C-alpha cells in the first residue's frame, strides 16, 4: 500500500526545552488527553520517494528542464567523517556522499542513490538491527530523519522536530523498536523516538557542548549513553508517578584529565568502558571513573585516540586511530580495581590486528556473510576494509575492498580524447578513473600532497596521456598514463588496465603549487604558487625553464588567452585582490643570465577596489525614490477620486517624514579574496570574489597606465552582474560547455548551478535564470573543480568533502548521432622506447633546491 503523506501520519513533537540542571523530560505521550492521542500509522503506510527527495530546481522551469543534468556516479568517499559506513547485507555498503546516500554493491560495483529530503546535507546514517530499514538523519533548518526500507529503498517514516539545525548521530535499540538521535549546536537535543509511529517519546538537552554519539545499551534498553567534547553522560528511561522520564547523570573525571570521548560501550552489568584522546580506556561505574586501563609497562592501549569500542558475543574490542584493533579479556576489564594512587591498571590484549602504518580507523560494523561473521571498517586514510576477527588459524587476511582519496579533492582534469579523468589530493595520491565504466583504474603515491593538476592538451601530447601535477612542497611532476598491454613483449602480463609513469620532476617554487596552465599553442607551460611567483617553461620532450616573475600575491588561478585573441597573454589571479596580465615570454629572449628572474616582461596590473557598498547605496537611493514616487502617485490618485465625488480637497504637499540616514560607503580593510575568473575579451575579464564582495560577477579591464605602484592602485570594475543568492554563498569555480552553451558554477555550499547562455556576452538578462542542485555537503563540500568531458557528454565535480560526482549532460535519446551510445575508454599507448628507459629519479626531500 502506497499513499501520499497524510496529515495524521505526521508527528507533532513537543518543542519544549530543558534547563541544564533539570535534565529529565516527561514523555509527550503520557501528557496527552485521550482526545489528543493520534491515530496509529498502519504498518503498510509508505511515502512516495518523488514527494520526499530534494531534486534539481530551475528558476524558470518553462525555459530550463530540471533534467538538464542527470546524476550518474559517485567516485569519492567522505572517509574523514566520524562514522560514515553501514552494511545492509554481505555485499552492500552504505555511506554518505554529499546530499546522497550511496548504496554500493561490492561485488558488481554498481551503485544506488537516495537524495536528502531537503537538500541541506546529511548528518548520519544507521542501519536497523534487522537490516530491513535504515535511518538517514539530515541537516538544515528543522531537519528530518527519514527511515527507508531495504532493499526496496522506499521512504517509510519521516521524523520531525528532533533538533534545530543538524542531526549528528542516531542509534536503534537492540530490538529495533526505538531510535535515539542527537542534534548539533545550538540545542544538542537528545530525542527518543517511537519511530514506527513518528512519535517523540522523550527528549532532553544532552549537554551544552558538542555531542558526538548516542547509543543504547545492548543489555538494558532503558539505558543510553551520550558523549562528546569533554564529557560523557549516562541516561536512564525511568517510569515515575508522572510518566516516563529521561534522567541523565554526568560522568565525573575526578583526578583523570578531561578528555573528548568519541567511543564507549555499556557492559552487561551496567558499567561503561570509554576511550580517551591519549589511547587508554576508562572504566566507569556509578558516574565515576573506577580505573584507567593501559597496557603492560604503562603503554597506552592505542597510540592516539580510541575511535570505537564494541562488545560482541562476550568479547570487548577497541578500534584505534593507530590502525589497530585489539581484543581484551572482558572479565579482566569488568573486574579491574585500582591498586595504587595512579588509578592505572595494566593488562594485555588477548589478540590484535594491525592494518598498517598508513591506516587510521574510525568505525567498524559486523555483518554475516553466508553465516560467517565479517567486519567492515572505515579507514580515514581512504579505504573500506573487510576484516575477519575470529583470530584462528583459519582467519582470512584483511582485505581493502575499496580505496579512495582521503580528505578534500584539490584538483581534477580530463583527457582531451577519451573518458579518463585524473584527481589529486593532500593524501599524496594521483588517481586515474574511467568515467565511462565508473571504475578507478590506477593510483600513484608521492611524498607530498597534490595541490594542482591539469591534463596536457592534444597540441602538447597527441596521444593524450600526459598530466602535470603540482604539490604542496613546490614540486611539479609530469606523469604519463598508458596501456601496459601495448608495451613490447608485455602481452598478457600486465595486471593493470592503465599504468602511471613518472616522466619528469622539477621544483620551481618554495611553497604549494596552486595553478598550472598550458599556452594555447602548447609552446609554454606556466606554474603559479603561494610563494607569489609564476614560473614559465618551454614545452619539449623535457620541459626546460624560461624563468619566473614575481606577482603581488599568492597565485589563485592562471588562464591563458583563448585562440580568438590576437596576442597570447596569461591572466594571473592572486588571492589578495590582484589580477596581472603578461605576454607569453619568448624562450632565449629573457635576461636570466644570473638568475631565472625575468625582470623585463611587460606587466599590467588590476588591483580590485570594492564597489559593493556603493552599489548597495545606489540601490537604497533608488528604492527610496521609487517609494516616494509611489506614495505621491497614490496621493494624487486619492485627490482625483475625491474630486470626482464632488469633494473639495486642498492640494497641499505632505510633510516628508524624516528619513533614516543613508548607509556610509564601506571598503573592507582586508581585501576580498579572488576566487575565480576568466577572459571575456583581450584585456578584459570577469571575477568572482569571496568575503564582503561576494554576490556579484565583476567585469574588469586592465588599464594602460602601469607606472603606478601596484599596491597603490584602486581599480574599479566597469560592469557588474548581481548573482542571485550568492551574498553568503560565493561562486568558487566557473566552467563552460560550448556545444550546448552553458556556464557552470560551483558554489561554496557544495551546490552546482548551470546557466543557459543565449548569447556569447554575459549580462544581467543572460544570467537571470538557472538550474541548480545541492550535490556536495553543504558545510564542507565547497566545489573545488568542475570540468566537462572531451565530448561534453559528461560533467564532473569534485569537492572539499572528498566526493567526486559525474553527471550526464544528455539523456540516451539526446545523444547526437555522431557520438557512440556508450562511453568506451581508450587508454593512451605508451611512448616509443618507454620500456627501455631507466626509471625517473624522483625528488624526495623537502629541502630540494628551488
Task: Label the predicted regions.
Residues 2-4, 8, 12-15, 19-29, ...:
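Terminal intrinsically disordered, low-complexity extensions flanking WD-repeat/beta-propeller proteins
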Residues 72-100, 121-123:
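Beta-strand-rich domains and repeat architectures in extracellular enzymes and scaffolds
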Residues 74-77, 114-118, 159-163, 204-207, ...:
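Surface loop/turn motifs at the tips and blade-to-blade linkers of beta-strand repeat domains
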Residues 80-85, 120-127, 164-172, 209-216, ...:
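Canonical WD40 repeat/beta-propeller blade segments in eukaryotic WD-repeat proteins
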Residues 90-92, 111, 131-136, 143-144, ...:
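Structural hallmark of WD40 beta-propellers
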Residues 103-111, 142-157, 164, 186-202, ...:
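Per-blade loop-tip surfaces of WD-repeat and WD-like beta-propellers in eukaryotic adaptors/scaffolds
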Residues 137-141, 182-186, 226-229, 275-278, ...:
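Conserved strand-to-loop turn within each blade of WD40 beta-propeller repeats
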Residues 179-277:
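Solenoidal tandem-repeat scaffolds enriched in leucines and small polar residues
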Amino acid at each position: 500500500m502506497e499513499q501520499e503523506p497524510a496529515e495524521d501520519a505526521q508527528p507533532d513533537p513537543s518543542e519544549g526545552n530543558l534547563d541544564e540542571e533539570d535534565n529529565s523530560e516527561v514523555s509527550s505521550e503520557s501528557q496527552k488527553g485521550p482526545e489528543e492521542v493520534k491515530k496509529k500509522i498502519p504498518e503498510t503506510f509508505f511515502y512516495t520517494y518523488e514527494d520526499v527527495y530534494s531534486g534539481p530546481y530551475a528558476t524558470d522551469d518553462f525555459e530550463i528542464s530540471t533534467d538538464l543534468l542527470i546524476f550518474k556516479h559517485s567516485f569519492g568517499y567522505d572517509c574523514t567523517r566520524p562514522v560514515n559506513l553501514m552494511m545492509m547485507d554481505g555485499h552492500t555498503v552504505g555511506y554518505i556522499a554529499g546530499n546522497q546516500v550511496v548504496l554500493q554493491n561490492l561485488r558488481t560495483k554498481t551503485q544506488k542513490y537516495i537524495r536528502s529530503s531537503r537538500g541541506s546535507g546529511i548528518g548520519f546514517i544507521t542501519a536497523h538491527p534487522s537490516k530491513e530499514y535504515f535511518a538517514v538523519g539530515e541537516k538544515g533548518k528543522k531537519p528530518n530523519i527519514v527511515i527507508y526500507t531495504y532493499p526496496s529503498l522506499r521512504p517509510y517514516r519521516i521524523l520531525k522536530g528532533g533538533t534545530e539545525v543538524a542531526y549528528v548521530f542516531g542509534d536503534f535499540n537492540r530490538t529495533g523498536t526505538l531510535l535515539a538521535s542527537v542534534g548539533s549546536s545550538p540545542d544538542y537535543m537528545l530525542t527518543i523516538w517511537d519511530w514506527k509511529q513518528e512519535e517523540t517519546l522523550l527528549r532532553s538537552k544532552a549537554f551544552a557542548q558538542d555531542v558526538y554519539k548516542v547509543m543504547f545499551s545492548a543489555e538494558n534498553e532503558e539505558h543510553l549513553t551520550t558523549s562528546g567534547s569533554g564529557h560523557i553522560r549516562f541516561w536512564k528511561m525511568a517510569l515515575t508517578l508522572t510518566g516516563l522520564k529521561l534522567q541523565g547523570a554526568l560522568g565525573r573525571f575526578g583526578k583523570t584529565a578531561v578528555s573528548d570521548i568519541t567511543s564507549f560501550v555499556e557492559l552487561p552489568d551496567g558499567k561503561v568502558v570509554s576511550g580517551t584522546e591519549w589511547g587508554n580506556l576508562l572504566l566507569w561505574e556509578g558516574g565515576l571513573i573506577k580505573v584507567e586501563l593501559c597496557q603492560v609497562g604503562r603503554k597506552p592501549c592505542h597510540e592516539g585516540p580510541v575511535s570505537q569500542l564494541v562488545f560482541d558475543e562476550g568479547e570487548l574490542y577497541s578500534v584505534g586511530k593507530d590502525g589497530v584493533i585489539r581484543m581484551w579479556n572482558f572479565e579482566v576489564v569488568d573486574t579491574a580495581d585500582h591498586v595504587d594512587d595512579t588509578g592505572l591498571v595494566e593488562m594485555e590484549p588477548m589478540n590484535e590486528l594491525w592494518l598498517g602504518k598508513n591506516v587510521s580507523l574510525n568505525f567498524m560494523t559486523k555483518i554475516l556473510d553466508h553465516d560467517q561473521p565479517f567486519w567492515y571498517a572505515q579507514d580515514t586514510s581512504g579505504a573500506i576494509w573487510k576484516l575477519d576477527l575470529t583470530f584462528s588459524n583459519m582467519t582470512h587476511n584483511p582485505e581493502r575492498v575499496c580505496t579512495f582519496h582521503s580528505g578534500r579533492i584539490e584538483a581534477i582534469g580530463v583527457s582531451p580524447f577519451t573518458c579518463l579523468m585524473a584527481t589529486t589530493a593532500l593524501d599524496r595520491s594521483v588517481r586515474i578513473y574511467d568515467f565511462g565504466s565508473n571504475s578507478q583504474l590506477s593510483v600513484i603515491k608521492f611524498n607530498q600532497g597534490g595541490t594542482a593538476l591539469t591534463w596536457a592538451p592534444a597540441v602538447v601530447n597527441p596521444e593524450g596521456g600526459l598530466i602535470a601535477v603540482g604539490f604542496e612542497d613546490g614540486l611539479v611532476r609530469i606523469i604519463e598514463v598508458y596501456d601496459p598491454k601495448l608495451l613490447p613483449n608485455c602481452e598478457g602480463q600486465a595486471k593493470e588496465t592503465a599504468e602511471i609513469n613518472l616522466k619528469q620532476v622539477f621544483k620551481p617554487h618554495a611553497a604549494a603549487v596552486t595553478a598550472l596552465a598550458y599556452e594555447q599553442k602548447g609552446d609554454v607551460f606556466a606554474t603559479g604558487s603561494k610563494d607569489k611567483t609564476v614560473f614559465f617553461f618551454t614545452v619539449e620532450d623535457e620541459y626546460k625553464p624560461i624563468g619566473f616573475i614575481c606577482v603581488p600575491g599568492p597565485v589563485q588561478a592562471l588562464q591563458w588567452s583563448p585562440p580568438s585573441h590576437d596576442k597570447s597573454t596569461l591572466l594571473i589571479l592572486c588571492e589578495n585582490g590582484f589580477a596581472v596580465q603578461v605576454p607569453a615570454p619568448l624562450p632565449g629572449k629573457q635576461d636570466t643570465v644570473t638568475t631565472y628572474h625575468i625582470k623585463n616582461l611587460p606587466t599590467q596590473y588590476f588591483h580590485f577596489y570594492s564597489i559593493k557598498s556603493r552599489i548597495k547605496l545606489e540601490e537604497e537611493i533608488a528604492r527610496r525614490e521609487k517609494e516616494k514616487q509611489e506614495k505621491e502617485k497614490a496621493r494624487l490618485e486619492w485627490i482625483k477620486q475625491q474630486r470626482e465625488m464632488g469633494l473639495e480637497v486642498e492640494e497641499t504637499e505632505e510633510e516628508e517624514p524624516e528619513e533614516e540616514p543613508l548607509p556610509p560607503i564601506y571598503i573592507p580593510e582586508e581585501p576580498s579574496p579572488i576566487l575565480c575568473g576568466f577572459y571575456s575579451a583581450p584585456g578584459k575579464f570577469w571575477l568572482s570574489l569571496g568575503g564582503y564582495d561576494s554576490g556579484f560577477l565583476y567585469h574588469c579591464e586592465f588599464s594602460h597606465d602601469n607606472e603606478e605602484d601596484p599596491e597603490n592602485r584602486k581599480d574599479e570594475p566597469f560592469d557588474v552582474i548581481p548573482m542571485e543568492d550568492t551574498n553568503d554563498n560565493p561562486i568558487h569555480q566557473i566552467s563552460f560547455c560550448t556545444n550546448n552553451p552553458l556556464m557552470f558554477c560551483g558554489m561554496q555550499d557544495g551546490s552546482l548551478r548551470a546557466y543557459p547562455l543565449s548569447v556569447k556576452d554575459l549580462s544581467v538578462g543572460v544570467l537571470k535564470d538557472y538550474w541548480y542542485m545541492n550535490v556536495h555537503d553543504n558545510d564542507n563540500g565547497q566545489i573545488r573543480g568542475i570540468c566537462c568531458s572531451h565530448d561534453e557528454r559528461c560533467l564532473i565535480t569534485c569537492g572539499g568533502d572528498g566526493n567526486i560526482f559525474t553527471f550526464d549532460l544528455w539523456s540516451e535519446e539526446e545523444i547526437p548521432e555522431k557520438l557512440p551510445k556508450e562511453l568506451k575508454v581508450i587508454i593512451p599507448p605508451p611512448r616509443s622506447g618507454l620500456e627501455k628507459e631507466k626509471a625517473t629519479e624522483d625528488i624526495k626531500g623537502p629541502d630540494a633546491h628551488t
